[in-house]
């Protein structure tokens, strides 16, 4: 898998332990090298993609897409109704990338209590509410 140091740069060790214990962490390998990972968390009937990362050298090879599909399969296997994530609006390719995978932006008026909590935590980390958006997809969504 990815080195602890590489993973620590993104999620804290404690969060990592939690993700591992909840079975919500997958590491993608390419030619036996760690190439990316996805960390998920289950909230009631939904699966939240907390982070998805592909190392720069392994970009544009379908790894991110495969990791998202893995999370959607997990949600389906758990009988959950949806998968959601939060992403930066200003990164040009973000929204279209997730839309191709069946995600649609969620208006603030439709946020759940869990989404509100996630945003509050992000704000404590210094992330600006309006620069990011939630996107969600049905777990049953058939992806091409």
Report the location of each language-model feature:
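Conserved GNAT acetyl-CoA-binding A-motif
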Residues: 75-88
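Conserved beta-strand in the GNAT
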Residues: 27, 33-41, 48-53
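A short, internal acetyl-CoA/4′-phosphopantetheine-binding micro-motif in the GNAT/acyltransferase core
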Residues: 29, 52-60, 87-88
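Terminal substrate-recognition subdomain of acyl/acetyltransferases
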Residues: 86, 100, 104, 117-144
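Conserved acetyl-CoA-binding loop-helix of GNAT-fold acetyltransferases
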Residues: 54, 60-73, 99-100
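Conserved beta-strand-loop-alpha-helix junction that forms the acyl-donor binding cleft
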Residues: 85-94, 111-116
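Short hydrophobic beta-strand segments in globular cytosolic domains
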Residues: 35, 105-106
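Conserved GNAT-fold acetyl-CoA-binding loop/helix
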Residues: 1-16
């Amino acid at each position: 898998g990815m080195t602890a140091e590489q993973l620590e740069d993104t999620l804290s060790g404690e969060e990592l332990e939690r993700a591992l214990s909840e079975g919500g962490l997958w590491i993608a390998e390419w030619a036996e090298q760690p190439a990316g990972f996805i960390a998920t968390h289950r909230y009631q009937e939904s699966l939240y993609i907390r982070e998805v990362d592909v190392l720069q050298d392994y970009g544009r090879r379908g790894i991110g897409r495969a990791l998202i599909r893995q999370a959607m399969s997990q949600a389906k296997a758990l009988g959950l109704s949806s998968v959601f994530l939060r992403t930066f609006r200003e990164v040009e390719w973000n929204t279209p990338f997730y839309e191709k995978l069946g995600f649609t932006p969620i208006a603030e008026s439709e946020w759940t209590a869990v989404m509100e909590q996630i945003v509050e935590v992000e704000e404590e980390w210094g992330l600006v509410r309006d620069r990011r958006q939630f996107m969600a997809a049905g777990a049953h969504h058939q992806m091409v």
